[in-house]
UniProtKB/Swiss-Prot annotation:
InterPro entries: AB_hydrolase_1, AB_hydrolase_fold, PPase_methylesterase_euk. Residues 44-69 have a biased composition (Low complexity). The active site is at S240, D266, H412. GO terms for molecular function: protein C-terminal methylesterase activity. Its EC number is 3.1.1.89. This is Protein phosphatase methylesterase 1. It comes from the Eukaryota. It is an enzyme of class 3 (hydrolase). Pfam families: Abhydrolase_6. Belongs to the AB hydrolase superfamily. Keywords: Hydrolase, Serine esterase. Residues 1-69, 181-203 are annotated as: Disordered. It comes from Neurospora crassa (strain ATCC 24698 / 74-OR23-1A / CBS 708.71 / DSM 1257 / FGSC 987).
Length: 454
């Protein structure tokens, strides 16, 4: 309010108090001098009525806007953020998503299909898997994780699939050297197949052919354990390394007509081979351990390795274990980086030492694109970006040899970052390849036998 207005208001109030007519506001042709500092003070002051001005049509009225929140003087305005205070990093148990867990033991012996080490010492392997059984004639989605992950990588996805296809089943295994699957040296004493020799286990074989054979064995052992008369219709789903494994199994046609199709998540031969060149550099920058399981989950979310906190809270517990547990002889199939870390500052370590798997990297991905296009069954490729396509797959996609879906907003772990969208794509893929929905026309011979004209 200008000085002239103040004088007029004072005179008006005084005349009213004395019962005199109100004075007219003087008219002046001289405008008061504009003072920018005074104007700013007036604009910053409270609005009439003592209430702060609030315009709901303005973005400034949003709760997230700094214009509507006036902090107290003692509040640290420029303090460093302390993370997601309201976001829980508590682990989510596997029972939230799966019906049961299976420990499937493959005995050592010449007729049992057991593996042998380079020194021809028989080994015994106990596969660990998570299962939700299919209902009726529902399909079974069999999933295989990538290197360094576990079967829990597909936990949240399995729940989303069941929401859209309630009769579907999901079988998610831990590959050898991952999760809770263990390989031991079998006893040489007859009748003691469940015991170990007490010696160090043989070197772990992570070749592509072995992993594909493991996947087939897990499917067969699950059928036996669940007393299924026959295999349900199967959709194979593999992420990264798992994509190469399911492609290898599909190309072998060992599952026969039970296999409806296979889906590969974010792995392409050319892109994978290029990425291997920088893998050791990436591993050297990754933390060697964590102070707690919650810290491990928090790191995966903050580093955007996994962009969905619910997925991280579910899958990360399958990647880490206390140092004491990793030092058990039956779990030392791979060097796990425990040496020289006797302190307890970061007792939670990676279950799988990815650097030690380097001898197998090239074997996993060489020829992947060709095998993917040649294998029988429906084919689908889910990518986080079209730049990942190599020449062979680009030509195949133009020829309509497989279905392609791209999620540019996802990271490498597509199924964990976007479980809902991935589930929608997989359920739609199953429906397109579901043979039970096919309606075939009647045979001519049957029509003639019924006396109908053809």
């Amino acid at each position: 309010m200008s000085e002239l207005q103040k004088q007029w208001a004072k005179a008006r109030l005084g005349s009213q108090a004395l019962g005199q007519p109100p004075a007219e506001m003087p008219i002046t042709t001289t405008m008061p001098e504009f003072n920018e500092a005074d104007e700013d003070k007036e604009m910053a002051g409270p609005s009439p009525g003592g209430f702060p001005f609030d315009d709901d049509s303005s973005s400034a009225s949003s709760v997230s806007s700094t214009g509507t929140v006036i902090p107290s003087p003692g509040r640290a305005l420029f303090a460093r953020p302390q993370g997601f205070a309201s976001r829980s990093m508590d682990p989510i148990p596997w029972t939230t998503y799966f019906e049961r867990e299976l420990f499937l033991k493959e005995e050592a012996g010449p007729d049992s299909g057991s593996r042998t080490s380079n020194k021809n010492k028989p080994t015994s392997i106990t596969y660990h898997a998570y299962l939700t059984s299919p209902v009726g004639k529902g399909p079974l989605f069999v999933t295989h994780h990538g290197a360094g992950s576990s079967g829990l990588s597909f936990a949240v996805l399995s729940s989303e699939i069941r929401k859209r296809l309630p009769n579907a089943g999901i079988l998610s295994l831990d590959a050898r050297g991952h999760g809770s699957t263990t390989v031991t040296a079998a006893s040489s004493v007859p009748g003691e197949g469940d015991e170990t020799t007490g010696q160090a286990p043989p070197p772990l074989d992570l070749s592509l052919s072995t992993l594909a054979s493991d996947l087939f064995t897990v499917i067969q052992l699950t059928r036996t354990a669940m007393h299924w008369p026959e295999l349900p219709p199967i959709i194979l789903v593999g992420h990264s390394l798992g994509g190469a494994v399911v492609t290898e199994l599909a190309k072998s046609y060992r599952l026969g007509p039970s296999l409806l199709g296979y889906a590969v998540l974010d792995v392409v031969e050319g892109c994978a081979m290029d990425a291997l060149q920088s893998m050791q550099t990436y591993l050297s920058t990754r933390p060697q351990g964590f102070a707690s399981l919650k810290d491990g989950i928090d790191w995966h979310v903050r580093s955007r390795t996994i962009r969905n906190s619910t997925s991280a809270r579910t899958s990360v517990p399958g990647l880490l274990a206390p140092v004491e547990e990793l030092q058990r002889p039956e779990l030392q199939q791979l060097p796990r980086g425990v040496a020289g870390t006797q302190g307890t500052a970061k007792p939670w370590r990676w279950k799988t030492d990815l650097a030690a798997t380097q001898p197998f990297w090239e074997d996993w991905f060489v020829g992947l694109s060709k095998k993917f296009l040649e294998a029988r069954g429906g084919k689908m490729l889910l990518l986080a970006g079209t730049d990942r396509l190599d020449t062979e797959l680009t030509i195949g996609q133009m020829q309509g040899k497989y279905a392609l879906q791209v999620f540019p907003e996802a990271g490498h772990f597509i199924h964990e970052d976007l479980p809902e969208k991935t589930a929608i794509a997989l359920v739609d893929f199953h429906r397109r390849n579901d043979r039970s929905q096919l309606v075939l026309p009647p045979k001519v011979s049957d029509l003639l036998a019924q006396g109908k004209k053809v």
